[in-house]
């Protein structure tokens, strides 16, 4: 491998380019002596030399460059410093080697500078570690603690941009919750089947009498040894079976004539421990479902009202976030979750799928076979609208979702009976009225007061203008009258003077 000639170091305050003076032909460059030299500042300065340091103009530029580097892109700032400080390729020397910390940045630099070969091997990482260790001494003009503060500020800004933290619209928890809910459903089903099979050796008839997994696990914990069941257990059994004394009595009767074998206390103890795990997982699954519903009503109330909390959460999870879902067209929302079928249909030139995740909605199951595609298209359109309202409204409310749901129900009825549906304009007007109605009385009163004060101000301005106009007109009339009087006096005087002259 070619020796390293230059080193690129990305600081939170700017980019630095170093020239590597280490004679890498020596076998020592591959031994511990190099790492020891790196730890000593005096010895490390003999290995590298600062060529140029280009500071960022501000925190915004630093964050922009950090985002570019994380995505493996060459920013304009990085391109400029490399262009100015790396020697151009010549006939004698065609390529230049540059040590970088992130190997994903290499292809982008190679694309911009074809004569630069990027290296991120162990030696390159050791040299970069040395620069990071002695940064305050290498970059002149920096005070103690400046680099740490810059790193902290940039780290917070970068993390905030990545997480996109928002108390009201933190949809990341929804994505994690729905993924965990799906996993729990699979695990509970698998574990419950194992409990049924295991306990079935002792009491095989119970599985047919009680098909529900959670109830079965609870009964296993209560019954344990089937021989302990008697008529006194009827009341407690009925409590576990939703007060169904008929099934409880059948359980007791079957326990007396059961074909199952007896099992030891140790085996029964293990069965009960596993049944307890299934019951606790089922309890946690219920808590998680309640949490998901609550979170969906906070983050995406209209989408939840329209299509349900679970399907809405699946749509958000599949899109990546509520913002991504709101940016997608209704046709994309319609087939979310059916990508494999879509690409298979495009490849074989067959019929594309009509629905994806929204297939599990009650609206599509209610529609007839010929109307399933039509209602799925209409429902996807309303889901797209609901997600946009949820994402961009400052105070999300479920009133728009309830009106959109009403429209979908009416459209479903229209396909069956031909009854006309509510128009979009009227539906939105109705939703806006409900939205304003739901606002607190104080807020509505404040809005009314603002409107009335604005109206009063306009009326006062009109009156003031009217008064000014009247004053102006009076003044003009007065001036005209004065001019007329002056003219009349002048005319009389002139006539008098003429008569006097004629007599003389």
Swiss-Prot record:
GO terms for cellular component: 90S preribosome; box C/D methylation guide snoRNP complex; nucleolus; nucleoplasm; nucleus; small-subunit processome. The modification Phosphoserine is found at residue 321. It comes from Saccharomyces cerevisiae (strain ATCC 204508 / S288c). This is Nucleolar protein 56. SUPFAM superfamilies: Nop domain (SSF89124). GO terms for molecular function: mRNA binding; snoRNA binding. InterPro entries: Nop56/Nop58, NOP58/56_N, Nop_C, Nop_dom, Nop_dom_sf, NOSIC. Changing residue 355 to C: At 37 degrees, growth slows after 6 to 8 hours and cell division stops after 20 hours. Gene3D superfamilies: 1.10.287.4070, Nop domain. Residues 468-504 have a biased composition (Basic residues). Required for 60S ribosomal subunit synthesis. Residues 439-504 are annotated as: Disordered. Belongs to the NOP5/NOP56 family. Changing residue 385 to R: Reduced growth rate at all temperatures. One of its GO terms (biological process) is box C/D sno(s)RNA 3'-end processing. Residues 439-452 have a biased composition (Basic and acidic residues). It is found in: Nucleus, Nucleolus. Residues 299-417 form the Nop domain. Interacts with NOP1 and NOP58. Component of the ribosomal small subunit (SSU) processome composed of at least 40 protein subunits and snoRNA U3. Keywords: Nucleus, Phosphoprotein, Ribonucleoprotein, Ribosome biogenesis. Present with 13500 molecules/cell in log phase SD medium. Pfam families: Nop, NOP5NT.
């Amino acid at each position: 491998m070619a020796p390293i000639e230059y080193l690129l170091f990305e600081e939170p305050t700017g980019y630095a380019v170093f020239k590597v003076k280490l004679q890498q032909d020596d076998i020592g460059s591959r031994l511990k002596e190099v790492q020891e030299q790196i730890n000593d500042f005096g010895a490390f300065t003999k290995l590298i030399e600062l060529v140029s340091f280009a500071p960022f103009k501000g925190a915004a530029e630093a964050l922009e460059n950090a985002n570019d580097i994380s995505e493996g892109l060459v920013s304009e700032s990085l391109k400029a410093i490399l262009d100015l400080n790396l020697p151009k390729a010549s006939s004698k020397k065609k390529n230049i080697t540059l040590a970088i910390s992130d190997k994903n940045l290499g292809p982008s630099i190679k694309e911009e500078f074809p004569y630069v070969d990027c290296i991120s091997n162990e030696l390159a990482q050791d040299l970069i570690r040395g620069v990071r260790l002695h940064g305050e001494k290498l970059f002149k003009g920096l005070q103690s603690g400046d680099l740490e503060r810059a790193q902290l500020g940039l780290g917070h800004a970068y993390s905030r941009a990545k997480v996109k933290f928002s108390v009201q619209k933190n949809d990341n928890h929804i994505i994690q919750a729905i993924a965990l809910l799906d996993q729990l459903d699979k695990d509970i089903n698998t574990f419950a089947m194992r409990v049924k099979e295991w306990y079935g050796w002792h009491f095989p008839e119970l599985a047919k009498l009680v098909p529900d997994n959670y109830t079965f696990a609870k009964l296993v914990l209560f019954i344990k040894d089937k021989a302990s069941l008697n008529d006194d257990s009827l009341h407690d059994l009925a409590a576990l079976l939703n007060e169904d004394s008929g099934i409880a009595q059948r359980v007791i009767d079957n326990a007396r004539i059961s074909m199952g074998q007896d099992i030891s206390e140790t085996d029964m103890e293990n069965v009960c421990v596993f049944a307890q795990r299934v019951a606790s997982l089922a309890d946690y699954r219920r808590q998680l479902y309640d949490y998901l519903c609550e979170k969906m009503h906070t983050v995406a109330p209209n989408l939840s009202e329209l299509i349900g909390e679970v399907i809405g959460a699946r749509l958000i999870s599949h899109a990546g976030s509520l913002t991504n879902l709101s940016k997608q067209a209704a046709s994309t929302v319609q087939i979310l979750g059916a990508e494999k079928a879509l690409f298979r249909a495009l490849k074989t030139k067959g019929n594309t799928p009509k629905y994806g995740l929204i297939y599990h909605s009650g609206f599509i199951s209610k529609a007839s076979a010929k109307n399933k595609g039509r209602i799925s298209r209409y429902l996807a359109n309303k889901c797209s609208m609901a997600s946009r309202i949820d994402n961009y409204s400052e105070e999300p409310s479920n009133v728009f979702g309830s009106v959109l749901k009403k429209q979908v129900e009416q459209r479903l009825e229209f396909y069956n009976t031909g009854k006309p549906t509510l128009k979009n304009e009227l539906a939105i007007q109705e939703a806006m009225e409900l939205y304003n109605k739901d606002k607190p009385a104080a807020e509505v009163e404040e809005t009314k007061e603002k409107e009335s004060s604005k109206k009063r101000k306009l009326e006062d301005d009109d009156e003031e203008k009217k008064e000014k106009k009247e004053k102006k007109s009076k003044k003009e009339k007065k001036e005209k009258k004065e001019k007329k009087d002056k003219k009349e006096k002048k005319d009389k005087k002139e006539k008098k003077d003429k008569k006097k002259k004629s007599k003389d």
